[in-house]
Amino acid sequence: MKLYAKLLLCSICVAFIAVRWSAPSFNEESLKGARVLVTGASTGIGEQLAYHYARLGAQIVITARRGNVLEQVVSKCREMGAQKAFYIPADMANPSDADLVVKYAIEQLGGLDYLVLNHIGPSPYQMWDGDVQHTRWLLEVNFLSYLQMAQKALPTLEKSKGSIVVVSSLLGKICGPFALPYASTKFALNGFFGGLQNELAMQKSNVSITICILGLIDTDSAMEKIKGYINMTAYPSHEAALQIIQAGATRQSESFYPWYTFYATLFRDWFPYLRDKVIQNSYTYNP
């Protein structure tokens, strides 16, 4: 075996051991009665987040655009054991809605322990067609509203020694095709909240930030988008949601799900030519 191959194998082993041994243990009881706001909670990962928090006995406020669907999710959350469960419809393309949602959650729950930012706006899965306006709109929904909600929630989270949990993507770490506007918003999230982690630490803040890097998850919207473009295993949304909750509860700075997202991020700059070839060959493109 050549030297560089041995070094690579050793690095992988060290990284794996470091991740397995450094992650703090998760105590489900710590979330009993916790005051949680989850965005994008009508379907997909956000819906699963709401159900897990409910099962763990948290107090929940959920938001998304469709009030009728949120009502059904809240009803199920109450059945599953949520101490309290409320919903508020909101459109995160409207800057005033972001403030109103945080204000509503604080009023209903008496404060916040967790702000879980998960919502995204719809975006076509295709080669970029030059539509700058759509990218600008998506930045408002997927990025700027996150900043606005974090800013609004920071004072109450400081008092409760709470956490901001940001649901991001491997596409915010590695450049892939067909989702450029979406990926741009995730790169922006990773950059901003990664920097905010350092600023809060330097200020000795009580607030932690967890950035969750997700790979392909089996939500209905994701499966519909990638059909005919990529053949890759999709991982369960309920497992992704539980991983997000555990990472936030244990105040990890960064979390990766599924396993390959960690290694893809770790080695992305080691072999750029190979990396790009793997990415390009993983997709189907028929001009």
Swiss-Prot record:
Keywords per UniProt: NADP, Oxidoreductase, Secreted, Signal
Q: Which reaction does it catalyse?
A: cortisone + NADPH + H(+) = cortisol + NADP(+)
What do the Gene Ontology cellular component annotations say?
Answer: extracellular region; intracellular membrane-bounded organelle
What's the main place this protein lives?
Answer: secreted
Where is the secretion signal located? 1-22
Q: Summarize where substrate binds, as residue positions.
A: S169
**Compartmental location:** Secreted
EC nos = 1.1.1.-
Concerning InterPro entries, the annotation shows: 11-beta-HSD, NAD(P)-bd_dom_sf, Sc_DH/Rdtase_CS, SDR_fam
Q: Which PROSITE patterns match?
A: ADH_SHORT
Which residues are named in the active-site annotation? Y182
Annotated residues for binding of NADP(+): 40-66, 91-92, 118-120, 182-186, 215-221
A matching Pfam family? adh_short
- Please name the GO terms that the record assigns under molecular function: oxidoreductase activity; steroid dehydrogenase activity
SUPFAM superfamilies hit by this protein: NAD(P)-binding Rossmann-fold domains (SSF51735)
Keyword Acyltransferase attributed: no
Stated role:
Unidirectional NADP(+)-dependent cortisol dehydrogenase (in vitro).
Question: What is the similarity comment for this entry?
Answer: Belongs to the short-chain dehydrogenases/reductases (SDR) family.
Q: What is this protein called?
A: Hydroxysteroid 11-beta-dehydrogenase 1-like protein
What is the organism field in this record? Danio rerio
Supply the source organism's classification: Eukaryota, Metazoa, Chordata, Craniata, Vertebrata
**What gene is behind this protein?**
hsd11b1l
